[in-house]
Amino acid sequence: YSSCGLCGSTSLKKLRLKTKVNLTSISHKKLLPVNSLFGLPKLMRQHQVLFTNTGGVHSAALFNDLMALQFVYEDIGRHNAVDKVTGALLTLTEPIRAEGLHILVVSSRISFEIVQKTVMAGIQVLAGVGAPSDLAIKAAQQFDLTLIGFLNEQGCNVYHGDWRLNTDG
């Protein structure tokens, strides 16, 4: 287990007590075509200036349900890159934030802390190029977060929340 960022605890109960966001109550009008997600890491990579220069930073990007890039941020710490994206999202006005599904894509594995930050920001879909931890999967299940790992141009693994995805065609 990894720590959850809440006083060093690995408890989902503590996150549940702190979380006021209900991801299932956030309205969305359409399903995301799962094959449209496959190109998102490449699109994110095209905007990674620091990674191009150093090869040593992580990135996090926010896409809307039309797969349009909203933000991409880089940092040496994967959690910091996520913080930058969620911070930028939270500065937007409420109507813009409520326009539909948002997809957070990370260039790393998916830890519980990243799931926690995604849930707290009200983002419904989290996808990473690496694997999610066991605790990340359990948290995604508890909070109805669509969790996708090993996202690449050939496919992905959906660990939870496939009802937000259209797998036809």
For the regions a protein language model found, what residue spans apply to each?
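Short flexible/disordered coil segments
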Residues: 36, 162-169
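A broadly conserved detector of short glycine/acidic/proline-rich loop/turn motifs that flank catalytic sites
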Residues: 66, 110, 163
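Short beta-strand-to-turn element immediately C-terminal to the catalytic PLP-Schiff-base lysine
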Residues: 63-64, 159-161
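Conserved active-site and cofactor/substrate-binding residues in soluble primary-metabolism enzymes
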Residues: 2, 7-10, 32-35, 39, ...
